[in-house]
């Protein structure tokens, strides 16, 4: 079995033991540096990274193939990629970039095809001078989202 396939198989086995964790990204470069990015339904703890790292490291032979292994959690600054990530962030504010707009909106609902968000903006009054606050509620298809990042509010 090729090295990359062996790593993928071991990773799948490791994640099967921890169903609350899921893979965001797996990258194996030409010098056999393995970079695994994880997320979890309840976040990712250091021990989760250690457990997945050990499930791979303990089953690969460094005498056979020299490699480096890095297991990390998806940071808050990384864009959301999977529906499962959107689901765990319902009720949080996202910065969403599409081809036509960039908005900061509250994530209300998540389906397999799209998300529903709500945000407000100041717009000119239809009658008279000045501006009024308008609340927008919109469904955005995943295909239309170029980037979505969770905004951390302190």
From Swiss-Prot:
Instruction: Write out the annotated subcellular location.
Output: Cytoplasm
Question: What is the top-level taxon of the source organism?
Answer: Bacteria
Q: Which UniProt keywords apply?
A: Cytoplasm, Ribosome biogenesis
Q: Which GO terms describe its cellular component?
A: cytoplasm
The cross-references to Pfam families, in alphabetical order and at most eight, read: RimP_N
Q: Assign the protein's first listed, main location to one coarse class.
A: cytoplasm
- Give the family this protein belongs to, as stated in its UniProt record: Belongs to the RimP family.
What biological function has been recorded for the protein in this entry? Required for maturation of 30S ribosomal subunits.
Protein name per Swiss-Prot or TrEMBL? Ribosome maturation factor RimP
Report the source organism: Flavobacterium psychrophilum (strain ATCC 49511 / DSM 21280 / CIP 103535 / JIP02/86)
């Amino acid at each position: 079995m090729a090295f990359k396939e062996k790593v993928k198989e071991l990773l799948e086995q490791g994640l099967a033991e921890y169903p609350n964790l899921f893979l965001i990204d797996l990258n194996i470069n030409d010098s056999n540096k393995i970079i695994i990015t994880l997320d979890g339904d309840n976040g990712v703890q250091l021990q989760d990274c250690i457990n997945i790292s050990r499930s791979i490291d303990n089953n690969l032979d460094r005498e056979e193939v020299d490699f480096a292994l890095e297991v990390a959690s998806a940071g808050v600054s990384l864009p959301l990629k999977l529906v499962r990530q959107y689901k765990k962030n319902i009720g949080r504010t996202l910065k969403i970039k599409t081809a036509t707009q960039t908005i900061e909106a509250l994530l209300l609902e998540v389906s397999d095809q799209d998300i529903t968000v709500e945000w407000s903006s100041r717009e000119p009054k239809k009658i008279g001078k000045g501006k009024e606050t308008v609340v927008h509620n919109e469904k955005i298809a995943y295909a239309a989202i170029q980037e979505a990042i969770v905004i951390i509010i302190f």
